[in-house]
């Protein structure tokens, strides 16, 4: 739509809405209850043919936000009214001033609606003026987490263009940090950490301008958690990782030293969020932290205290080839009590949710020789325990058991193919929908595995397996509804 020309011909619902608003002062308690339905009727009357005349009510619809009525019908009407309009069209109606007001509205839905509408602007052409941009920045401080998160994503995307990145730098000063509470500091630090990953130049500017204030020496738990999250964000780009891992900043050393302290929500966050991601992206750094700070020993000591976080983390370590090789080098494979996977841990793998979650991670090991090394030291009843757990009444336990069975089917399907009880379980037709899908997926994965596939010795079960794979996961006539009803 290149231009909007207001023409006569407003539909009847539009005229009725205007009349209701005109009569509102005479009987407000009655008329105000009719307005939401009138707005809905007006929305239904908007068509490509009537839209030009309906746009004459834009001011009127926007004024309805001031009434004590639900905001949903107003936003739906606005959404349909403005749907095909470009930012240039919207600017002809003075949309920026409306949006500045809308971003201060007490309704979260209205604020988010306005933030979404701003995405129609061409940021490369600098179509967002400074007053509106400042209103977007103010949304970071909103009482609504949803509004703050939406504004953060919007500013992050706009900062692809240096003009808006520089506006953020210009409008935010170090003094702002000094007067902010912990919640707001967390929001702004998170935004600046994300912006730092866009380019080395942005990182340099944020550091030079005291925007990226990363401080690991905090007593406030919110800031402690945010310290971990900020470093986690900066793992993602090579240049930000180089910065946080340098000898100058020593942030990784701080993380490792803090993790060795007492178990609390801060160190749990390190073990659950930061170290697994570091292991995935930069496994050599994990080994380096062990050489400098005996990180592996610290994790194993925490595991002995039944610490679920460290048990999960160790499974992540075992899923990485580089880290697993370092564990074997340090602890060996012979001493059952102290080897790289202690005997007690192999039993814990099969006991509870943290143990089985850790086991599922460990079975992701991509190196086949290391995968088989792990399998050889597992308890003899590992497969039977997994099959039994796959029938557990607890949904999460079933899911984890099948997750492990899927990894086994992919990496060493002979372990399942050689056990009749396991094949019989996978061929069962009854069960809830999810269970039937998972059984089918394990069978399918076995047949497609590069470690045997169709050549596996299925014996008398071969025809049944092929038939099931042709039928699909849900067998016609199987009593899945009964089980599903019992589960519900």
From Swiss-Prot:
Keyword tags: Cytoplasm, Nucleus
First-listed, main subcellular location of the protein, grouped into a coarse class: cytoplasm
Full protein name: Uncharacterized protein C18.17c
GO molecular function list: protein folding chaperone
Cellular compartments per GO CC: cytosol; nucleus
GO BP: proteasome regulatory particle assembly
Location in or out of the cell: Cytoplasm; Nucleus
Domain of life where this protein originates: Eukaryota
Taxonomic lineage: Eukaryota, Fungi, Dikarya, Ascomycota, Taphrinomycotina
Source species of the chain: Schizosaccharomyces pombe (strain 972 / ATCC 24843) (Fission yeast)
């Amino acid at each position: 739509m290149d231009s909007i020309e207001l023409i006569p011909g407003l539909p009847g619902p539009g005229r009725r809405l205007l009349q209701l608003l005109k009569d509102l002062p005479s009987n407000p308690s009655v008329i105000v209850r009719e307005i939401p339905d009138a707005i809905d009727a007006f929305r239904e009357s908007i068509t490509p043919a009537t839209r030009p005349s309906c746009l004459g009510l834009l001011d009127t619809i926007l004024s309805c936000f001031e009434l004590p009525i639900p905001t949903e019908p107003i936003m739906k009407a606005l959404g349909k009214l403005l749907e095909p309009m470009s930012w240039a069209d919207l600017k002809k109606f003075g949309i920026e001033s409306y949006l500045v007001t809308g971003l201060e509205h007490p309704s979260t839905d209205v604020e988010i609606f306005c933030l979404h509408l701003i995405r129609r602007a061409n940021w490369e052409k600098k179509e967002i003026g400074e007053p509106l941009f400042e209103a977007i920045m103010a949304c970071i401080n909103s009482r609504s987490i949803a509004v703050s998160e939406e504004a953060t994503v919007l500013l992050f995307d706009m900062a692809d263009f240096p003009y808006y990145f520089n506006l953020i730098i210009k409008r935010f000063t170090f003094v702002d940090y000094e007067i902010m509470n912990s919640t707001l500091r967390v929001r702004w630090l998170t935004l600046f950490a994300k912006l730092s990953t866009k380019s080395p130049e942005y990182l340099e500017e944020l550091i030079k301008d005291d925007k990226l204030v990363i401080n690991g020496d905090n007593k406030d738990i919110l800031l402690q958690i945010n310290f971990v999250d900020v470093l986690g964000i900066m793992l993602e780009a090579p240049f930000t990782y180089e910065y946080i891992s340098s000898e100058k900043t020593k942030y990784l050393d701080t993380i490792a030293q803090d993790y060795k302290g007492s178990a609390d929500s801060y160190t749990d966050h390190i073990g659950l969020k930061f170290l697994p991601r570091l292991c995935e992206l930069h496994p050599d750094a994990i080994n380096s932290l062990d050489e400098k700070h005996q990180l592996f020993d610290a994790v194993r000591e925490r595991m002995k205290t039944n610490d679920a976080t460290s048990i999960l983390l160790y499974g992540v370590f075992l899923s990485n080839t580089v880290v697993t090789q370092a564990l074997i080098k340090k602890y060996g494979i012979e001493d059952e009590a102290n080897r790289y996977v202690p005997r007690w841990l192999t039993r814990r793998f099969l006991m509870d949710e943290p143990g089985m979650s850790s086991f599922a991670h460990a079975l992701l090991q991509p190196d086949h020789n290391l995968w088989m090394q792990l399998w050889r030291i597992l308890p003899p009843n590992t497969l039977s325990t997994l099959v039994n757990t796959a029938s557990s009444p607890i949904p999460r336990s079933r899911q984890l058991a099948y997750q492990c069975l899927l990894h086994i089917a992919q990496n060493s399907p002979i372990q399942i193919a050689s056990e009749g009880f396991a094949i019989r379980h996978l061929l069962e037709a009854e069960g809830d929908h999810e269970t039937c899908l998972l059984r089918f997926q394990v069978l399918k994965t076995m047949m497609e595995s590069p470690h045997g596939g169709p050549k596996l010795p299925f014996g008398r079960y071969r025809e049944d397996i092929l038939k099931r794979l042709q039928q699909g996961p849900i067998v016609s006539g199987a009593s899945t509804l009964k089980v599903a009803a019992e589960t519900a």
